[in-house]
Protein backbone atom coordinates (compact mmCIF):
# COMPACT_ATOMS: atom_id res chain seq x y z
CA UNK A 1 0.00 0.00 0.00
CA UNK A 2 1.37 3.41 -1.02
CA UNK A 3 1.87 6.05 1.62
CA UNK A 4 -0.11 9.25 1.38
CA UNK A 5 3.06 11.19 0.55
CA UNK A 6 3.91 8.78 -2.30
CA UNK A 7 0.35 8.99 -3.67
CA UNK A 8 0.46 12.77 -3.50
CA UNK A 9 3.82 12.90 -5.30
CA UNK A 10 2.44 10.71 -8.09
CA UNK A 11 0.01 13.50 -8.99
CA UNK A 12 2.97 15.64 -10.05
CA UNK A 13 5.23 12.94 -11.47
CA UNK A 14 2.62 10.87 -13.34
CA UNK A 15 2.51 11.24 -17.08
CA UNK A 16 -0.37 13.47 -18.15
CA UNK A 17 -2.12 11.08 -20.49
CA UNK A 18 -5.36 13.01 -21.04
CA UNK A 19 -4.95 15.62 -23.79
CA UNK A 20 -7.49 18.17 -24.98
CA UNK A 21 -7.80 18.19 -28.77
CA UNK A 22 -8.98 21.82 -28.81
CA UNK A 23 -6.28 23.59 -26.77
CA UNK A 24 -3.56 20.95 -26.41
CA UNK A 25 -3.50 21.00 -22.60
CA UNK A 26 -2.74 17.69 -20.86
CA UNK A 27 -4.21 16.40 -17.62
CA UNK A 28 -3.64 13.63 -15.07
CA UNK A 29 -7.33 12.83 -14.72
CA UNK A 30 -10.09 12.29 -17.27
CA UNK A 31 -12.51 14.25 -15.07
CA UNK A 32 -10.31 17.35 -15.34
CA UNK A 33 -10.13 16.92 -19.12
CA UNK A 34 -13.96 16.69 -19.19
CA UNK A 35 -14.13 19.94 -17.21
CA UNK A 36 -11.69 21.59 -19.60
CA UNK A 37 -13.75 20.54 -22.64
CA UNK A 38 -16.72 22.54 -21.27
CA UNK A 39 -14.68 25.72 -21.67
CA UNK A 40 -14.57 25.17 -25.43
CA UNK A 41 -18.33 24.67 -25.90
CA UNK A 42 -21.09 27.26 -25.94
CA UNK A 43 -23.06 25.27 -23.37
CA UNK A 44 -23.54 26.88 -19.97
CA UNK A 45 -25.34 24.25 -17.91
CA UNK A 46 -24.75 25.82 -14.48
CA UNK A 47 -27.23 28.62 -13.78
CA UNK A 48 -27.44 30.97 -10.80
CA UNK A 49 -30.98 30.88 -9.36
CA UNK A 50 -30.50 34.36 -7.92
CA UNK A 51 -29.63 36.37 -11.03
CA UNK A 52 -30.00 33.95 -13.94
CA UNK A 53 -26.37 34.16 -15.10
CA UNK A 54 -25.11 30.86 -16.57
CA UNK A 55 -21.65 29.30 -16.42
CA UNK A 56 -19.70 26.58 -18.20
CA UNK A 57 -18.19 25.16 -15.02
CA UNK A 58 -19.72 24.33 -11.65
CA UNK A 59 -16.73 25.81 -9.81
CA UNK A 60 -17.29 29.18 -11.52
CA UNK A 61 -20.94 29.11 -10.47
CA UNK A 62 -19.92 28.32 -6.88
CA UNK A 63 -17.57 31.32 -6.81
CA UNK A 64 -20.26 33.51 -8.38
CA UNK A 65 -22.84 32.43 -5.77
CA UNK A 66 -20.54 33.58 -2.96
CA UNK A 67 -20.12 36.98 -4.59
CA UNK A 68 -23.82 37.14 -5.38
CA UNK A 69 -24.79 36.37 -1.78
CA UNK A 70 -22.43 38.99 -0.37
CA UNK A 71 -22.98 41.75 -2.90
CA UNK A 72 -26.62 42.11 -3.78
CA UNK A 73 -26.14 45.71 -4.75
CA UNK A 74 -29.00 46.16 -7.19
CA UNK A 75 -32.42 46.13 -5.53
CA UNK A 76 -35.86 46.42 -7.15
CA UNK A 77 -37.66 49.42 -5.60
CA UNK A 78 -41.06 47.86 -6.32
CA UNK A 79 -40.71 44.50 -4.57
CA UNK A 80 -37.30 44.51 -2.84
CA UNK A 81 -35.77 41.57 -4.73
CA UNK A 82 -31.99 42.01 -5.04
CA UNK A 83 -29.57 41.16 -7.84
CA UNK A 84 -25.81 41.17 -8.25
CA UNK A 85 -25.86 42.58 -11.78
CA UNK A 86 -27.57 45.76 -13.02
CA UNK A 87 -28.56 44.12 -16.32
CA UNK A 88 -30.46 41.40 -14.45
CA UNK A 89 -32.32 44.02 -12.41
CA UNK A 90 -33.22 45.89 -15.61
CA UNK A 91 -34.66 42.71 -17.16
CA UNK A 92 -36.55 41.97 -13.95
CA UNK A 93 -38.04 45.50 -13.82
CA UNK A 94 -39.42 45.02 -17.34
CA UNK A 95 -41.42 42.09 -15.96
CA UNK A 96 -43.04 44.44 -13.41
CA UNK A 97 -43.93 46.94 -16.14
CA UNK A 98 -45.37 44.23 -18.38
CA UNK A 99 -47.33 42.66 -15.55
CA UNK A 100 -50.45 44.75 -16.08
CA UNK A 101 -49.72 46.78 -19.19
CA UNK A 102 -53.05 46.50 -21.00
CA UNK A 103 -56.06 47.97 -19.21
CA UNK A 104 -59.72 47.71 -20.17
CA UNK A 105 -61.25 51.21 -20.47
CA UNK A 106 -64.71 49.79 -19.74
CA UNK A 107 -64.13 48.11 -16.37
CA UNK A 108 -60.51 48.86 -15.42
CA UNK A 109 -59.38 45.23 -15.40
CA UNK A 110 -55.69 44.91 -16.44
CA UNK A 111 -53.90 42.21 -18.43
CA UNK A 112 -50.31 41.25 -19.24
CA UNK A 113 -51.03 40.53 -22.91
CA UNK A 114 -52.90 42.56 -25.51
CA UNK A 115 -54.56 39.43 -26.91
CA UNK A 116 -56.05 38.66 -23.47
CA UNK A 117 -57.43 42.19 -23.25
CA UNK A 118 -58.96 41.82 -26.72
CA UNK A 119 -60.72 38.59 -25.67
CA UNK A 120 -61.87 40.23 -22.44
CA UNK A 121 -63.39 43.21 -24.30
CA UNK A 122 -65.84 40.84 -25.99
CA UNK A 123 -67.62 40.62 -22.63
CA UNK A 124 -68.49 44.31 -22.95
CA UNK A 125 -69.35 44.31 -26.66
CA UNK A 126 -71.30 41.07 -26.79
CA UNK A 127 -75.07 41.54 -26.61
CA UNK A 128 -76.61 41.24 -23.17
CA UNK A 129 -79.69 39.23 -24.11
CA UNK A 130 -80.70 38.14 -20.62
CA UNK A 131 -82.51 40.97 -18.83
CA UNK A 132 -83.97 41.01 -15.34
CA UNK A 133 -87.62 42.16 -15.47
CA UNK A 134 -87.47 43.45 -11.90
CA UNK A 135 -84.30 45.59 -11.94
CA UNK A 136 -83.55 45.96 -15.66
CA UNK A 137 -80.01 44.64 -15.22
CA UNK A 138 -78.79 42.74 -18.31
CA UNK A 139 -76.47 39.73 -18.55
CA UNK A 140 -74.43 38.04 -21.25
CA UNK A 141 -75.18 34.54 -19.98
CA UNK A 142 -78.43 33.07 -18.71
CA UNK A 143 -76.59 31.71 -15.67
CA UNK A 144 -75.72 35.28 -14.70
CA UNK A 145 -79.40 36.27 -14.81
CA UNK A 146 -80.42 33.14 -12.85
CA UNK A 147 -77.92 33.96 -10.13
CA UNK A 148 -78.97 37.63 -10.09
CA UNK A 149 -82.68 36.79 -9.67
CA UNK A 150 -81.86 35.19 -6.32
CA UNK A 151 -81.13 38.69 -5.00
CA UNK A 152 -84.82 39.51 -5.54
CA UNK A 153 -86.30 36.15 -4.48
CA UNK A 154 -83.95 35.79 -1.49
CA UNK A 155 -83.46 32.17 -2.58
CA UNK A 156 -80.29 30.80 -0.95
CA UNK A 157 -79.47 27.43 -2.52
CA UNK A 158 -75.85 27.20 -1.34
CA UNK A 159 -75.56 25.91 2.22
CA UNK A 160 -72.43 25.61 4.38
CA UNK A 161 -72.08 22.06 5.78
CA UNK A 162 -70.06 23.39 8.71
CA UNK A 163 -72.47 25.95 10.21
CA UNK A 164 -75.62 25.69 8.09
CA UNK A 165 -75.51 29.25 6.76
CA UNK A 166 -77.29 29.58 3.40
CA UNK A 167 -76.02 31.89 0.68
CA UNK A 168 -77.21 33.23 -2.67
CA UNK A 169 -74.05 32.63 -4.72
CA UNK A 170 -71.62 29.72 -4.88
CA UNK A 171 -68.64 32.11 -4.91
CA UNK A 172 -69.92 33.67 -1.67
CA UNK A 173 -70.16 30.19 -0.11
CA UNK A 174 -66.56 29.47 -1.17
CA UNK A 175 -65.37 32.69 0.53
CA UNK A 176 -67.53 31.95 3.60
CA UNK A 177 -65.96 28.48 4.05
CA UNK A 178 -62.59 30.17 4.64
CA UNK A 179 -63.91 31.35 8.01
CA UNK A 180 -63.92 27.72 9.13
CA UNK A 181 -60.68 26.61 7.45
CA UNK A 182 -58.61 29.72 8.16
CA UNK A 183 -57.48 29.68 4.52
CA UNK A 184 -56.37 33.04 3.16
CA UNK A 185 -57.64 34.04 -0.29
CA UNK A 186 -55.27 33.75 -3.24
CA UNK A 187 -53.84 37.26 -3.76
CA UNK A 188 -53.86 37.01 -7.56
CA UNK A 189 -57.52 36.00 -7.48
CA UNK A 190 -58.48 39.26 -5.75
CA UNK A 191 -56.36 41.40 -8.06
CA UNK A 192 -58.76 40.66 -10.91
CA UNK A 193 -61.70 42.35 -9.14
Curated annotation (Swiss-Prot):
Key word Ribonucleoprotein present: no
Any one GO BP annotation for this protein: regulation of transcription by RNA polymerase II
Superkingdom as given in the UniProt entry: Eukaryota
GO CC terms, sorted: nucleus
InterPro entries from the UniProt entry: Znf_C2H2_sf, Znf_C2H2_type
SUPFAM superfamilies with a match to the protein in the record: beta-beta-alpha zinc fingers
Record bears the keyword Nucleotide-binding: no
Span of zinc fingers (C2H2-type): 18-40, 46-68, 74-96, 102-124, 130-152, 158-180
Keywords assigned by UniProt, alphabetized: Metal-binding, Repeat, Zinc, Zinc-finger
Xref: PROSITE patterns: ZINC_FINGER_C2H2_1, ZINC_FINGER_C2H2_2
GO MF term list: DNA-binding transcription factor activity, RNA polymerase II-specific; RNA polymerase II cis-regulatory region sequence-specific DNA binding; zinc ion binding
PANTHER family: C2H2-TYPE DOMAIN-CONTAINING PROTEIN-RELATED, ZINC FINGER AND SCAN DOMAIN-CONTAINING
Protein name (Swiss-Prot/TrEMBL): Putative zinc finger protein 726P1
Organism, as annotated: Homo sapiens
Amino acid sequence: MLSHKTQHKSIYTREKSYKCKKCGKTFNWSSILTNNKKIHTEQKPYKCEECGKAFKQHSTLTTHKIICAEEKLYRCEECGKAFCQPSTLTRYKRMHRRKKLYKCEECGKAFTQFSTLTKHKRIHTRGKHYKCEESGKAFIWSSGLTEHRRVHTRQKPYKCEECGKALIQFSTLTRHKRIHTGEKPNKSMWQTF
